[in-house]
Each structure stands twice: as structure tokens, then as C-alpha cells.
């Protein structure tokens, strides 16, 4: 009798007579009905490959359902609920009937050792499945899904892995070694995260579960409760370090109370050095307080001595950046700090006198003294009401060139500017003066007025400018050397420059005579407080440094 056929008179959709019957009906069952289950599958008339091969994929299991659970144990018929000996069968696509194996026949032989034996291992030695199940009831397992019974297909046959919340694989322990089922059940409850954080944060859900305890302890031990007891009081543990740590910090604060004043002083240092005029010496004090961190109080007494050198060192780093920046700010706008630095670069003895006195009185450079003796700068009487003459705006890239123009009484513009100035000078000849209104790009003020005294010599290069690209030179005579802010002249607009303010002019921009009179009047009558003379020694020092660099370049080129 073939294992794949039951009764030739039975229709395909007819139910099994013994499926829903009780155990007492087994007396009415004939012995021939059990032959397909007791005999081996020896007839090779199957039209589909044998399922005993563990490497073949299951073709038909998804179409078969299992309405009962094997969680009832032990398997005896005395007083136990009726257990069916025959299972339902699914109709195969080829028209033949295929009977799934029954859990009752766990011994070798029959269908138990052929169909799915190697793959599923449905028949373990111990039939007490109640000890392997989860904390849920048996009825919940059967009602959870169509595959919620113990005969669910393993993840390998379904082509996927166990997903969180998939209750159809609670009884996969049948096809796994002891302990593997509990491991998977424990992993289902776990969430994404490392082991330590999950064990602590999910104390009530993960650690207390039977599945995870069995996995961690090995043979169902209770060793997991040891680490569980620690995180249960983690609120108390968190409260302990949270409270004493702030207290320790607060205690350390007053101990190092002397170090608290320096941080605000640092801000005052930055602000005072650039914006304020007076607190420049005060700003230098905090620089030394943070550097030695050990004892700030005794150093405050010794600070007056080292207070002065730091501001002297700072201008050396700040001043070289001035000619490089297009938006340059005159150092004298910082007043005493840069006035002292200018004198200190050339003469260190002038530092002591620089603090109480004003910046102009500090300057005692011999070159500046000779210039003041030879020229009467900023005259009180000046004829600004010109009857004839021409006035031009001169825009300089750096104040270094202004310093050298005053020192050598020369100037040089661009090629286009030289031609314009030379033509204006030759056109005026002796009819009237040609005045030049000097301003440094980005300075925000005019720095002086000079008169053009000679035509442009195009074949001569002065070689004293901060950049070597300038060619040609002409003589000038400086009349006013003072800083006049742009806000004093911004109201004067030039009709020959799109009616723009005179302060918004380009190099060699000519100013109409009537507007030039207004500009000259304001500059002559303006009472200045700063000028390039305040930083004359500073620029002298920079010129010496540039000459050293220029000589080194020349020596390298010769080699």
C-alpha cells in the first residue's frame, strides 16, 4: 500500500474520520488504516522528490496547517484529553494526498524517520513540551497564528529569520538543541543596543524573563538575579554621584577663587587693547595671571614690573598685519598702547614716560625731530580760499608709505595716476598749487595734506616703498599731518564722481575747486588728537626690518 494514498474510494476533500474523534474510537479503526504510518515509505512511485533529504527545500509545507498543539504531556491515554492519532493532510498540486507525520509516532520507523526528520527533528527524547514553552498559555500559542503550534516551520524553511513579535516560532525548540529556543526567545525581547545598556535599562522585561535566565545561567540557574539586583537601585546610585560631584566642584571653586577673576580680565584685555584708550596697561596684567596657574595672588603684587613689556611685544605681531589687510585701522586709534609700542620699538627708556603722558609727547625719534625742525606742520594760518589751483585725492595702500613720504618728501602713484598728476602740475605751472589729500584705504580718516612740488620723474624708482611695484617719483611738501575723520567731510559730495561723498573716492580723483575749498577749510580748522607722528617710531622700526629683508633678497638673487 502506497504511503501517499489512503483509500481509493475517499474523495479529495473528505475529512479523516479519526481526526475529530476521541481516543475511544480507536477500537473501531482497522489495522489497515495504520499501515501507511507504520510501514516505511518504500514505494518509489512519488512524483515529487523525497523530503528526507535535508538539503532539499520544502516545496509544500506552507500549504499545510496544524490545528493542534503538542504541549500536552505526557502522552498516555489514561485520563488525558483525547489526542488524535491522525493528522490532517494537505492536497498537493499533483493531485496526490500527502500525509504529514504524527507526533505520536516518535520511535524510529514509519514516517517519523523519513519526512523532515533531519530537518525538523520533531521527536525529541523528552515529550514533556510544557517545560520548553514560554510563559504564555497553550491556547494563546494555538490562536496566535496559523503556524502557532509546535509544528511551525523553522526560519530556515521559510527563508527568513525570527522577527520581533513573531509568535509563530515559540516552539522551535523541537528542531534545536536544548537551550537554543530560550536563547531565541530572549533575543526576541531584546532591542537594539549593547549588552550592558539593555541589561540595565530593561530590568523588568528582559532580565526577569525565564528564557534569558536559562540562557545566561546555562541550565536554568538563577545567577542572572545577581546583576539584576544592582541596576534595580540605579536611581539611588545615580543620586549618589550626582549630588557629591557638584558639591566637589563647588568646593574646588572657592579654593581656586583667585583664578576666577582672570577670565573676565581676559575679555577686558581683548577689548581694551583694540577699542579702549586708557586701559591698555590694565589689559596686559591678565596675560601673566593665567600663564602661571599656581599662585595668582603673589604675582599680582609683582605684576607692575612685567606689565609693560607684554604690550610692547603685541604691537610687533599686530603691526605687521596692518599693511597686509585691506581694511586697516590706524594704530593710533588705539592711542596709548600703540603710542607706547612705537617708542618702545626704538627706545625702551620711553616706556616709563609713555604711560602718564600723551602719545605725541612720547615720540622722541631723532628723524622725527629733524623733520619737525625743518618743516612747520599744521600751520595755524593757511590760505584755503584758493583763487586757482587743483586738488586731488590720494589713496594709499598702507600708512607705511605715508610715513616714508613724510620722511623723504616724495610720492609715487600708479602709472595712470602719475600721468594725471604730472599733467595737472604742468598745466598749473606757477598759476596755482596742486594739493594732494592723503587717505589710507580702510582707515576711515584723512591723514594729511601735501603740495606737489615737481613733475613726475618716470625713470626713477625711490625704492623705499613697502612694495617694489611703484615706478617714478615726484617731490611733495607736507603741510598738514593730522587725522581728520571721514564724518567731518562726508557731507561734501563731488559732482564729477556721480555725486558721491568726497570720502568715497578713488586714487587721483580730482576735487572741484569749490568743493576743495570746503575740504581744505575743514582739515585746516579741525583740532586733531591723533596723527601718524604718534606711530612714527613704530614705522621707523618697520622700515628697518623691511630693508633687512630687501637686502637678503638682493643677496639671494646675486648668488
From Swiss-Prot:
GO biological process: immune system process; learning; memory; mRNA destabilization; organelle assembly; positive regulation of translation; positive regulation of translational initiation; regulation of antigen processing and presentation
Superkingdom, taxonomy of origin: Eukaryota
Bias kind Basic and acidic residues: ranges: 24-33
Domain called YTH: residue spans: 389-523
Key word Kinase present: no
Keyword Acetylation: yes
Modified residues (N-acetylserine): 2
Subcellular location(s) per record: Cytoplasm; Cytoplasm, P-body; Cytoplasm, Stress granule
Maturation and modification: Ubiquitinated by the CUL7-FBXW8 E3 ligase complex leading to degradation. Deubiquitinated and stabilized by USP5 by removing 'Lys-11'-linked polyubiquitination.
One Gene Ontology cellular component: cytoplasm
Segments for region (Disordered): 1-49, 239-365
Binding-site list for RNA: 395-397, 401, 411-412, 441, 465, 470
Phosphoserine: residues carrying this PTM: 182
Primary location recorded for the protein, binned into one broad class: cytoplasm
Annotated Low complexity bias: 279-305, 314-326
Listed Polar residues bias regions: 343-361
Tissue: In brain, preferentially expressed in the hippocampus.
Domain statement: The disordered regions have the ability to interact with each other and to 'phase separate' into liquid droplets within the cytosol following binding to mRNAs containing multiple m6A-modified residues. This leads to the partition of m6A-containing mRNAs into membraneless compartments, where mRNAs may be stored, degraded or used to transport mRNAs to dendritic arbors in neurons.
Function: Specifically recognizes and binds N6-methyladenosine (m6A)-containing mRNAs, and regulates their stability. M6A is a modification present at internal sites of mRNAs and some non-coding RNAs and plays a role in mRNA stability and processing. Acts as a regulator of mRNA stability by promoting degradation of m6A-containing mRNAs via interaction with the CCR4-NOT complex. The YTHDF paralogs (YTHDF1, YTHDF2 and YTHDF3) share m6A-containing mRNAs targets and act redundantly to mediate mRNA degradation and cellular differentiation.
UniProt subunit comment: Interacts with CNOT1; promoting recruitment of the CCR4-NOT complex. Interacts with ribosomes. Interacts with eIF3 (EIF3A or EIF3B). Interacts with YTHDF3.
UniProt protein name: YTH domain-containing family protein 1
Gene that this sequence comes from: Ythdf1
Amino acid at each position: 500500500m502506497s504511503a501517499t494514498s489512503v483509500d481509493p474510494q475517499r474523495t479529495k476533500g473528505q475529512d479523516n474520520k479519526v481526526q475529530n474523534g476521541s481516543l475511544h474510537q480507536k477500537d473501531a479503526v482497522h489495522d489497515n488504516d495504520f499501515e501507511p504510518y507504520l510501514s516505511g515509505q518504500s514505494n518509489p512511485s512519488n512524483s515529487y522528490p523525497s523530503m528526507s533529504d535535508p538539503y532539499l527545500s520544502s516545496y509544500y509545507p506552507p500549504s499545510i496547517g496544524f490545528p493542534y498543539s503538542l504541549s500536552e504531556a505526557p502522552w498516555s491515554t489514561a485520563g488525558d484529553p483525547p489526542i488524535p492519532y491522525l493528522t490532517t493532510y494537505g492536497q498537493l498540486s499533483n493531485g496526490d494526498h500527502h500525509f504529514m507525520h504524527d507526533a505520536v509516532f516518535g520511535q524510529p520507523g514509519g514516517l517519523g524517520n523519513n519526512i523532515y526528520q533531519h530537518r525538523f527533528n520533531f521527536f525529541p527524547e523528552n515529550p514533556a513540551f510544557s517545560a520548553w514553552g514560554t510563559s504564555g498559555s497553550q491556547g494563546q500559542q494555538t490562536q496566535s497564528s496559523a503556524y502557532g503550534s509546535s509544528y511551525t516551520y523553522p526560519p530556515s524553511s521559510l527563508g527568513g529569520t525570527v522577527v520581533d513579535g513573531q509568535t509563530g516560532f515559540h516552539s522551535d525548540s523541537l528542531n534545536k538543541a536544548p537551550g537554543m529556543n530560550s536563547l531565541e526567545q530572549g533575543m526576541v525581547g531584546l532591542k537594539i543596543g549593547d549588552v550592558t545598556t539593555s541589561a540595565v535599562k530593561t530590568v523588568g522585561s528582559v532580565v526577569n524573563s525565564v528564557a534569558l535566565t536559562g540562557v545566561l545561567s546555562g541550565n536554568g540557574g538563577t545567577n542572572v538575579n545577581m546583576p539584576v539586583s544592582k541596576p534595580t537601585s540605579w536611581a539611588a546610585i545615580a543620586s549618589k554621584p550626582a549630588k557629591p560631584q557638584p558639591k566637589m566642584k563647588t568646593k574646588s571653586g572657592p579654593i581656586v577663587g583667585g583664578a576666577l577673576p582672570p577670565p573676565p580680565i581676559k575679555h577686558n584685555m581683548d577689548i581694551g587693547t583694540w577699542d579702549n584708550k586708557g586701559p591698555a596697561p590694565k589689559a596686559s596684567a591678565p596675560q601673566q595671571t593665567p600663564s602661571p596657574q599656581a599662585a595668582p595672588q603673589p604675582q599680582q603684587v609683582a605684576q607692575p614690573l612685567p606689565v609693560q613689556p607684554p604690550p610692547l611685544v603685541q604691537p610687533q605681531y599686530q603691526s605687521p598685519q596692518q599693511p597686509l589687510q585691506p581694511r586697516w585701522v590706524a594704530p593710533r586709534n588705539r592711542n596709548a598702547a600703540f603710542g607706547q609700542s612705537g617708542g618702545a620699538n626704538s627706545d625702551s627708556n620711553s616706556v616709563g614716560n609713555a604711560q602718564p603722558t600723551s602719545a605725541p609727547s612720547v615720540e622722541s625719534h631723532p628723524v622725527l625731530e629733524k623733520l619737525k625742525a625743518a618743516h612747520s606742520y599744521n600751520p595755524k594760518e593757511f590760505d584755503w580760499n584758493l583763487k586757482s589751483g587743483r586738488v586731488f585725492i590720494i589713496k594709499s595702500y598702507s600708512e607705511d608709505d605715508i610715513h616714508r613720504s613724510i620722511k623723504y618728501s616724495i610720492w609715487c602713484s600708479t602709472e595712470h595716476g602719475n600721468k594725471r598728476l604730472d599733467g595737472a602740475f604742468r598745466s598749473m605751472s606757477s598759476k596755482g598749487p596742486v594739493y594732494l589729500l592723503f587717505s589710507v584705504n580702510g582707515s576711515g580718516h584723512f591723514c594729511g595734506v601735501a603740495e606737489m612740488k615737481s613733475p613726475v620723474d618716470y625713470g626713477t624708482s625711490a625704492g623705499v616703498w613697502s612694495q617694489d611695484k611703484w615706478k617714478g617719483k615726484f617731490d611733495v611738501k607736507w603741510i598738514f599731518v593730522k587725522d581728520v575723520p571721514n564724518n567731518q567731510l562726508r557731507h561734501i559730495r563731488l559732482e564729477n564722481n556721480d555725486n558721491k561723498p568726497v570720502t568715497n573716492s578713488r586714487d587721483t580723483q580730482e576735487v572741484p575747486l569749490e568743493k576743495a575749498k570746503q575740504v581744505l577749510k575743514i582739515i585746516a580748522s579741525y583740532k586733531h588728537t591723533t596723527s601718524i607722528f604718534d606711530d612714527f617710531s613704530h614705522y621707523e622700526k618697520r622700515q628697518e626690518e623691511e630693508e633687512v629683508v630687501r637686502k637678503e633678497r638682493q643677496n639671494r638673487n646675486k648668488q
